[in-house]
Amino acid sequence: VKTSVVICVYTEERWEDIRQAVESVGNQTRQPHELILVVDHNPDLLLKLKRAYPQAVVVENTHEKGLSGGKNTGVDVATGDIVAYLDDDAVADPWWLEALEEGFQEPGVVGVGGRTEPLWASKRRPRWFPYEFDWTVGCTYRGMPEVRAPIRNVMGGNAAFLREVVSEVGGFHSGIGRSVQGRKSRPLGCEETEFCIRLSQRKPGSVMLFEPRAVIGHKVSRQRERFAYFRSRCYAEGLSKALVTREVGTQDGLSSERAHAMKTLPLGALRGLGEALRGDVGGLGRAFAIVVGLAWTTWGYVVGSARLKAVRS
């Protein structure tokens, strides 16, 4: 099997992050068929990367500006059987690619996602930050499987798909978040969720697999360690989910979220209160953050749904 690894990049400010991401791909126990660096409409960075990495395939994003356009460009250029995506601010463990590839040996598997661990800029997790909400910083969260298991959708920065299947279903949708943005630009990260559900709907029997042995570390900036970002990201996720349900329907679009909200989050809040009673003051903060996170996400969903109805009418 041949795997093309795609890293989408956009700014020189992340040069050191990009360097570490590329280095981690070079240190894999199973080397990729090719490494593709897709540059998002930044000619200076494109030239710099071509000079620094002559062994890589360095190309310009030929689709609409943004991460989805970059991912689609990667699929267009790739010649491998599998396309694996790694965030430009992530570092893959040496056995990451090997574990992803092994996941495709399971029957019906068209996509495999790995485990993403946070690399905190402050070197430690904020005491108030609940594990149930690690998705707000692009990481695997409490409530996801702990062993290899089918899941509804993978997380975009640590995932692999059969190349032909991505093309068959039309790739990743660009800019689907614009109609609910409002006056403020927000990080609407719903593209991979919508893509995975759309793929499963169009190709019944297709399996998305979670493979916890495919591990990467994802860097979390100090700004993203703040409670203000946490709230904003939760609200943006609610807006995103309104879009996802418009595209793929409420039943599929909210199935995982309902289970998380009805079971995992209440247990997490109770756990935090219990830890606070046992002397861990941070437990109170985690319980509070779970309540706020759920409320802000729900409010975002309500606002997003209302904006979509207004656009339709």
Predicted regions span which residues?
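Non-catalytic, C-terminal membrane-associated alpha-helical segments of glycosyltransferases
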Residues: 232-236, 250-313
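A short, conserved alpha-helix in the catalytic core of glycosyltransferases
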Residues: 158-161, 165-170, 176-214
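Conserved donor NDP-sugar-binding/catalytic core segment of glycosyltransferases
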Residues: 95-128
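N-proximal low-complexity "stem/linker" segments adjacent to membrane-targeting elements
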Residues: 1-24
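Glycine-rich, basic loop-to-helix element that forms the pyrophosphate-binding segment
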Residues: 61-78
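Short aromatic/hydrophobic "clamp" motif used to bind/position activated sugar donors
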Residues: 83
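Short, flexible, basic/aromatic active-site loop/helix in glycosyltransferases
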Residues: 130-151
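Short, acidic, metal-binding catalytic loop of nucleotide-sugar glycosyltransferases
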Residues: 22-32
